[in-house]
């Protein structure tokens, strides 16, 4: 059953109040990318069994942190922040932040290389998949079909590690969307946007 708006709002409130010192630290950062990736210090995605709920709660938490950080918007109450309807842009940002948070932990060596901080031989994953940053600094694969007319999300899927909760939620969501079709169909749909390493044991 899909989570209700009140359930999502309550979850967002709980995530915010459980780590007030971390919220304060993120609020005072000047780097928006630090604010976004730092969301992992405020939230634990293992609390969520539903991908949509994870993205919505993350969107509300990001909105709340931004409003705290922006001195001119501090007059807006926390209730207004959590009850105002989320936009497509909010959810797109939430999706990207969740993905980049997982990538930052799983692919630290690859990120260091892509940032130009390492001049040695590229890590195996960089060489194997032709990894690069997109405009949101999300890691994508160049793939073998990069010259086709397919959408970028299919030509250059986002790289995710196996055995991570976010990866599991993504596969589960695709499986449900495919009306519980077999593994092959589920993975085919997942790979329209994501490439999950060793997604079949």
What are these regions, as identified by a protein language model?
Residues 1-201:
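RNase H-like DDE catalytic core and adjacent DNA/metal-binding regions
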């Amino acid at each position: 059953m899909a989570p209700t708006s009140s359930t999502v709002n309550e979850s967002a409130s709980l995530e915010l109040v459980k780590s007030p010192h971390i919220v304060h630290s993120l609020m005072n950062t000047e780097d928006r990318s630090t604010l976004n990736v730092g969301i992992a210090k405020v939230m634990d995605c293992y609390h969520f069994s539903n991908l949509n709920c994870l993205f919505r709660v993350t969107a509300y938490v990001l909105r709340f942190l931004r409003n705290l950080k922006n001195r001119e918007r501090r007059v807006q109450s926390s209730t207004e922040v959590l009850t105002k309807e989320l936009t497509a842009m909010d959810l797109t940002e939430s999706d990207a932040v969740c993905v980049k948070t997982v990538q930052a932990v799983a692919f630290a060596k690859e990120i260091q290389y892509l940032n130009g901080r390492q001049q040695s031989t590229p890590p195996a994953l960089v060489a194997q998949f032709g990894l690069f940053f997109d405009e949101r600094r999300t890691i994508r694969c160049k793939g073998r079909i990069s010259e086709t007319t397919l959408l970028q999300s299919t030509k250059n899927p986002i790289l995710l590690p196996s055995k991570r909760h976010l990866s599991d939620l993504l596969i589960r969501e695709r499986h449900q969307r495919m009306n519980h079709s077999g593994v092959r169909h589920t993975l085919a749909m997942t790979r329209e946007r994501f490439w999950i390493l060793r997604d079949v044991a």
